[in-house]
Structures are given as C-alpha cells and as structure tokens.
C-alpha cells in the first residue's frame, strides 16, 4: 500500500560510503605495536546492569530479539495463573460483587522513570531496599508500565526522549502472573518527534507491519497487551485503519485498552463518558469488537457514569469488563473520595463501572522529592500509604470512613477522605490445588534470611521472590476495643523517620524466617482476635497437614494461638486447630504442625490465626515466618540442568548465569547461592527465569562456586546444580582504548603457567556493520588490537580466555563497553504524502541522532529530536521535481552523509 523504495536508496548510499572509507582494512592481529602507554587512558569495564528502554515506533518495526538490548535478561517467564471463582462467604465485605475490576498503571515499575536519581530500571533485582514493590495484587486485574526513555539516552541527561511504547518490567509481569493479574505496556502519543500516521498503514497482504511487531514484542517479553493512550489527533481517514489494526492485535490474543481521547472523527475530545462519540473504538457495527475496554477521562459526573454503564449494556457489552473510570492517583491522593465527591456508586453502594488508576505509584513516588523517597527511613511511610489506599484509612478491611482519619506522621497533612479500593473491588486469590507455601516475604529486605539466619547481609529488592502475600492487609477482627497492629518486620537494620526525626518501632525487630520480611502482630491482647490471612481453595486429603513457623519474642503469658480454617462445605463454621504452648516465649523460630486428615475431602476456603488471652497481655508480639499447607506428598523438583557461566565481568564482579527453565507446574522459582572457600553458603538472588544477572557478590574474592536450586510448589528446594568459579589462571585488570579505527585491549596475565590467551570481540545486541573477531596471543603479550571498520559507538563484549599447552581452556573473563563514536548513520526513512497533500518524513531508525537538517530548494530547516517538532507537513512542489536533502547529526556532533529524496509532482519518486 505504501512505497518503501527510498529505504533501498538510503542503504546503498550508506554502503557505498562505508566501502570507500574502509576498503583494504586488515584482519585482526596481535598488538605487538601497542604499549602500556597507549592504553594508559583506557577505561575499565562498564556495568552490565540490565535496564529497560522505551521504543520509538520505528524501533518496533525493526524489533528483533537478536538486536534488542537485554532481550534475554528482561523476559518474563511465569505463565498467567487462573484465579479462583469468587466465594462471597470469606470476603471481608460479603455483599460486595466481583463485577468491578481494577487497572493500576505505573505499578509495573520499581521506581519512577521521571527523575535523575532513579535508574530506568527493568532488571530482575537490585542491591537496594528502597524500591517500590506493589503488594496488593488481590485487588488488581491489570497492571501497567510508566514511560521509559529510548535506547542510548544517558541516565540523568536533560535530553530525554520517551518511547511511544513502554514495556512492564519482567519482574512485575512475573509477580503479576503469579497472582492472576495481566500486565499491559503503555502506548502514548504525542511523543515528539514521533507521530501516529507514520505507523498506520496496512501491507498488501492485509497485515499490519507495526501491529504485528507489537504482537511479537508482547509475546516475546511475556506481557499481555497494551494501553493505547492516543492523545494526538489524527485525520478522520485514518480512524477505520487504526481500528482494524487494534482488531488485528486483539485477534492474536493481545489485550487492548483504549483511552478516552480520540473520537469518531479522529480528533482528541475527552468525553469523560462512554458514549456514541467513542464507543466505536470498542465495538461498532462495521468492525465488531475492536479494543477490549476504555479508560474514561477524569472529569465525569455521576450521571455520566450511570449513562456510560447503560450505553455499554445497550451495545450488548458488560460495563464492568468494558468501562473503567479514570482515577488520577497523583492528583487526588487521599483528598478525593470517589463515592462522596463523584457519586460513582449507585444507591446500593455498587460502582457503576470498573476503575483505572493513573499514577498508581504516587504513594511512593510523590513524597520526599528528590531523594528521600529512595531512603530506607521513609519506606515505612510509603507502605502505610499504599495500605491505606488499597485497604482503608484504618488499614483494616471492611472498616471504612471518610474525613475522620488524619495521618501527618506519613507526610500527609490533610484528612484522609479516600475510603480504599477494598470497599469497591473484591479480593481475589490464586491459591488452589492441594499444596501452598508462603514465607511472608514481600520482595525486599535489609538482609536475606534463610531458616531464620542471615544468609545475605545486604539490602535487596526482587519482586520475583515475592510470595503470594496475605489476601488482606490487614483484616483483624477483635471481640473488644483492643486490636493488634500488624507490620512487615524487616529486622534490626530497618529504621524509620517520623516528621524528619529517627523514630523507633513499637515491636521487637526480628526479621524474616526466609526472605526479607516476616509478619509481626503486636500490641495489647485480650479476649479473642482473629487475624485473617489467606483466601484459598485448597483440597484436603487424608495426608494433608498445615504448619506454621512462628517466633514469639514477648514474655510467657496466658495467650493462646489457634489456626482457624473455614471450609467451603460449611462457611458459617470456623474450625480451630490449637498450637500447643503458644503462650510461651520462643527462643527463635519454632514450627507447629497439625494434621488435617480428619477433614479429608473438604476444601479450605480461608486461613486465619486466632489469638486470645484470658487476661490483658500488654506488649504482646508474635511473628509469622512461614505457612505451609501440605498434601503429604513430595513436591521437591529435580536439580536444575544446563547451568553455565555466560559472563563474569572483570573489575565490576558482575556475573551472568543461565540454565534450562523447568515447567512452572513443578518449579515455582530458582534460588542462586554463592559458595565460599570456608565451605559456607550465602544467598545471592533468584527468579523464575532461564538466566540471572548478579549485581554484587558479598566477599567476591572468596567465592569458589555458585549453586542454583529449583523451588517447588511446597517451598522445598531441590538438590543444587553447581558451577565452580576459578580463582586462578584468569586474566585481570582489563582495559580498552578505542581510537583510530582500532580497539586496543590490555590485561594482566595470571601468575600460573599457560600457553596463550584467546581474545574475542563480540558486538552486543548490535546492528553494526562490524564483524565479530578472535585473536590468539602468547602468554606475556598481555595486549591485542582489533581493527574496527566503523567507529559507531556500538556496545561490545571482549572475552579473554587462557588456553593451556594441551589446548584445554580455563575460565573466561568478560569486559563490557562501547566504541568511540565518530560516525553518524545517514537518514534511512522515507517521505509519505499525508491527507493534506504535504509530506511526512518517517522517524530515522538510527538510535543516535540529535538534529536533522532538511534542505528543500536551498532552504534548510533544522529539526530537533529532543523537545523539537516532528518532521511532518513539509511542502513540496505540486508541479515538477523537488529534491529534499536530509543530513543527520548525532549526539556527539558527527554528521551523516546527505541523503536525497525525490518528489515528482508532489509524490515520492525514484531515480528510475
């Protein structure tokens, strides 16, 4: 349908230039003429830390995992888990229907992407506690990603270009899928200098090239769909095409949510309702179903919401599946109550529609700017605010109020009016089958504990390790005015600030049993209190049992703890299973196990802990460290296979591992451990993935091996696969210098005897015209040079392996960096005629460009990539020949060879 001949012309011009400059360059050779002085300014290895970039639409068209940075490291692998059917009898609000859904946007990030202090992170884990971890999956149905800068934009740079597409990080998708929640990438327009019309075209075979790549991107990275935020007007002639493209994606299993922006005419006009002006993007008589749902703009009224619901019904659509009323989290915070201010519920208190929160991470990202929100002492505040937002102002499910709670201790000075989403959205669960295990590990910690002992003495964040958390955070039912407080206990290294001053916690900080956190229940205990923990659908067999690992640091008292179970067969009755001697102070962690054989054939619908005392107990505390429901069978997986060292980087001590991924039905996670020279073992990290990047090893110089264990459905670990790490016969102090079309590499040989060093240069996820090369040099040379055809700033990995006299090879050392940039690729796009008869230039595919100089009839216009304008609506002569000469300039000031586009009588033409 569209002409693409210009791309070939641009490619030929580029190829001719490269050949003319670099003809006759020699093969790689030992660098006999390179001295230590030549590389005295050489640089050490860069960090290999994975980070996620935003995608321009031209990046989408060219998407290929082989050239997309960190494509192997950023894949989500956990399959979407099926949620249990709603069981009202065990809900905090038994009258609440399961109709209303919840979409939380921005919770697919560890941190905001809009600040210099935060890396544009998308990795599996980080050596830092102070990241935002979403903990309320039970209310969410969809989670989204915030914007991300495009590839090769320096962190902290004032020149930011955000991608049209932002993909949720893999760790968020893994955690979401574990909890039955789908994840959506964000599509946002306008993103100058990109524009919509560039990618809206259909191929002659009926396919949509861009749409197909969006489908491919979702399937490769493991997320489920897209939130289409089209806030730029398009010509009405494009509307049917746009809808066909969305339909094309939907028919391939991709979920689509449309924002209340562009209407039937293509113009942006926020309806703040679902009506005939925008419903065609969801369903119309000509095309049928298009997008799955719509996100309503925020300026609605009760009447608008009521009419939106009815409009969906009139179209034969489920209003709760289709219509999501927008909630502007960062603007409203706790000050706006959707029920009293917007009358968003009917006379029975039922919402008219579902909900979508824009800026759902506001409770973490909008406080203590610019740095305090990433300090340990303020993280307790963020977690309190999150709990208030999703549960209630009192942090107790089923207990709601507006305008009566004030919490200036969490940096919120106004009265809390928001009542919490648990009032409108029912809690959901994926806990089913016959086995379940939780360590109450919420995904980050000041340390990592294993069996109650510190196994990693460093801060960490890793959503992949987050357990399925308690269904209610919190829901405590008390027989009197006393009610225990609940907190995540991160151990004695955790601290907090209150109004800028360091403050203490009112419980003994114990830490975790496994992971980074345990659940502390503390305060005054008298009478009976029930701490509701999990909503489940667990089958009980004759061999079933339930075990609880707990720690009671408070003194001996008259208290009694009982596991409380509700069965589906008779939800009006609670079965209590006493824990012997539970009133006694424990010396560390202890485990109580109770047989469930007497209830074989029944189904556990809810698990709670009932605590009681015959007299008032002050300063009571009990920590929960592990809960296991077992069917009496072994669910320990086999040891992992295929464990290998991919890279071990010189200088940074970063390590990249890979192994064979087991089936999620039997393997729920992988744990990585470091083995030390004294025989001890420490936890490193983990994920359900086929690879793992290690940012930091404690006492790396003493590590002799790495072990990987698979984790089963019952929380048990497999035997370890072990990978020895060599401490000898490895080169060190690797440095490189990229100049004069040579990459000079130096290193220090090990003291041990060997014959040669094999040096290999590999271009990393690169489309560069440079070729991979291998050089072999003798022991003692300690240097090599690689000829570089094109100094284009490409990233590369150099691997250095010592080779023994018998040909056997020792452990490889890796080095990661980028070439000097002295080259700007030429413009490789094309000119297209838009509906107004003017010319739109497609975005340059090259990652590294800053300015575009467009010369027409002797007049040159400069277009800026950052904060500039799109290369659209350019004028050419309607009669005769127009030559358009385009020159690009990159961020280092290099200018490309000019490319000439021809237009004859206002239409693209070729030299033919």
Give the predicted meaning of each segment:
Residues 652-665, 741-752, 837-846:
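Conserved aromatic anchor
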Residues 487, 529-561, 592-594, 627, ...:
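Extra-cytoplasmic beta-strand recognition segments
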Residues 714-728, 805-820, 893-906:
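Extracellular fibronectin type III
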Residues 693-718, 788-808, 878-894:
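Beta-strand-rich modules
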Residues 94-307:
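Chitinase-like catalytic core of GlcNAc-active glycosidases
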Residues 19-37:
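Sec-dependent signal peptide cleavage junction
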Residues 32-137, 255:
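N-terminal module-boundary/linker segments of secreted carbohydrate-active enzymes
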Residues 501-530:
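Short carbohydrate-recognition loop motifs
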């Amino acid at each position: 349908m569209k002409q693409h001949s210009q791309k070939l012309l641009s490619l030929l011009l580029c190829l001719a230039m490269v050949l003319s400059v670099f003809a006759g360059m020699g093969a790689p050779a030992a660098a006999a003429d390179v001295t230590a002085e030549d590389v005295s300014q050489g640089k050490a290895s860069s960090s290999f830390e994975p980070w996620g970039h935003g995608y321009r639409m031209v990046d989408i068209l060219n998407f290929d995992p082989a050239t997309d940075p960190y494509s192997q490291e950023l894949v989500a692998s956990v399959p979407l888990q099926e949620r249990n059917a709603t069981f009202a009898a065990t809900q905090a609000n038994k009258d609440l229907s399961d109709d209303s859904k919840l979409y939380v946007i921005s919770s697919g990030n560890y941190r905001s992407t809009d600040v210099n202090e935060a890396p544009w992170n998308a990795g599996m884990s980080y050596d830092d506690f102070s990241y935002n971890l979403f903990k309320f999956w039970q209310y969410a149905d969809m989670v989204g990603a915030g914007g991300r800068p495009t590839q090769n934009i320096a962190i902290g740079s004032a020149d930011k270009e955000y991608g049209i597409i932002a993909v949720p990080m893999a760790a968020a998708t893994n955690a979401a899928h574990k909890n039955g929640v789908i994840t959506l990438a964000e599509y946002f327009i306008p993103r100058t200098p990109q524009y919509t019309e560039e990618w809206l075209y259909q191929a002659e075979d009926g396919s949509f090239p861009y749409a197909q790549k969006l489908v491919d991107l979702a399937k490769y990275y493991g997320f489920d769909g897209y939130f289409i935020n089209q806030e730029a007007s398009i010509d009405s002639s494009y509307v049917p095409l746009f809808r066909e493209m969305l339909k094309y994606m939907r028919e391939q299993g991709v979920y689509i949510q449309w924002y209340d922006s562009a209407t039937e005419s293509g113009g942006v006009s926020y309806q703040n309702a679902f009506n005939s002006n925008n419903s065609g993007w969801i369903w119309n008589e000509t095309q049928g179903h298009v997008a799955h749902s719509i996100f309503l703009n925020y300026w609605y009224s009760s009447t608008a919401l009521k009419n939106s619901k009815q409009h969906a019904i009139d179209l034969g659509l489920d209003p709760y599946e289709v219509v999501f009323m927008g909630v502007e989290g960062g603007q409203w915070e706790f000050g706006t109550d959707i029920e009293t201010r917007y009358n968003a519920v009917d006379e029975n208190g039922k919402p008219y529609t579902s909900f979508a929160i824009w800026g759902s991470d506001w409770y973490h990202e909008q406080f203590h700017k610019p740095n305090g929100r990433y300090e340990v002492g303020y993280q307790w505040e963020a977690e309190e605010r999150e709990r208030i937002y999703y549960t209630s102002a009192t942090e107790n499910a089923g207990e709601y109020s507006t305008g009566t709670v004030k919490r200036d201790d969490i940096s919120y000075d106004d009265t809390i009016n928001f009542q919490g989403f648990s009032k409108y959205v029912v809690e959901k669960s994926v806990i089913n089958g016959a086995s379940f295990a939780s360590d109450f590990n919420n995904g980050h910690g000041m340390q990592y504990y294993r069996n109650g002992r510190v196994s990693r003495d460093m801060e960490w964040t890793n959503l992949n390790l987050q357990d399925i958390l308690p269904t209610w955070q919190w829901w405590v039912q008390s027989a009197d005015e006393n009610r225990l407080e609940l907190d995540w206990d991160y151990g004695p290294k955790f601290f907090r600030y209150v109004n800028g001053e360091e403050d203490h916690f009112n419980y003994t900080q114990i830490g975790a049993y496994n992971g980074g956190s345990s659940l502390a229940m503390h305060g005054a205990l008298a009478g009976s209190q029930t701490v509701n923990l999990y909503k489940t659908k667990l089958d009980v067999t004759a061999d079933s049992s339930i075990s609880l690992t707990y720690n009671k640091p408070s003194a001996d008292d008259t208290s009694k703890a009982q596991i409380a179970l509700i069965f589906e067969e008779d939800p009006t009755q609670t079965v209590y299973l006493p824990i012997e001697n539970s009133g006694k102070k424990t010396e560390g962690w202890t485990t109580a196990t109770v047989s469930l054989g007497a209830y074989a054939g029944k189904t556990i619908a809810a698990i709670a802990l009932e605590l009681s005392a015959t007299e008032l107990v002050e300063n009571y505390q009990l920590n929960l460290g592990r809960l296991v429901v077992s069917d009496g069978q072994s669910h320990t997986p086999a040891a992992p296979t295929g464990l290998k060292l991919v890279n071990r980087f010189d200088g940074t001590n970063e390590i990249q591992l890979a192994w064979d991924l087991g089936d999620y039905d039997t393997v729920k996670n992988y744990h990585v451990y470091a083995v030390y020279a004294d025989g001890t073992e420490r936890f490193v990290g983990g994920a359900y993935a086929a690879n793992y990047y290690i940012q930091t090893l404690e006492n790396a110089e003493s590590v002799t091996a790495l072990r990987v264990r698979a984790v089963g459905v019952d929380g048990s670990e497999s035997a370890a696969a072990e990978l020895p790490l060599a401490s000898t016969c490895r080169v060190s102090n690797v440095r490189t210098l990229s100049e004069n079309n040579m990459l000079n590499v130096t290193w220090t040989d090990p003291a041990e005897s060997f014959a040669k060093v094999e040096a290999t240069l590999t271009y990393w996820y690169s489309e560069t015209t440079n070729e991979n090369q291998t050089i072999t040099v003798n022991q003692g040379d300690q240097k090599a040079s690689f000829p570089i055809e094109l100094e284009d700033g490409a990233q590369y990995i150099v691997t250095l392996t010592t080779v023994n006299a018998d040909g056997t090879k020792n452990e490889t050392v890796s080095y990661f960096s980028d070439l000097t940039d002295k080259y700007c690729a030429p413009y490789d796009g094309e000119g297209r005629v838009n509906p107004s008869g003017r010319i739109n230039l497609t975005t340059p595919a090259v990652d590294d460009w800053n300015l575009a100089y467009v010369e027409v009839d002797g007049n040159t216009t400069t277009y800026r990539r950052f904060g500039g304008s799109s290369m659209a609506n350019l004028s050419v002569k309607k009669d005769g020949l127009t030559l358009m000469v385009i020159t690009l300039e990159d961020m280092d000031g290099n200018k490309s060879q000019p490319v000439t586009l021809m237009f004859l009588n206002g239409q693209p033409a070729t030299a033919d």
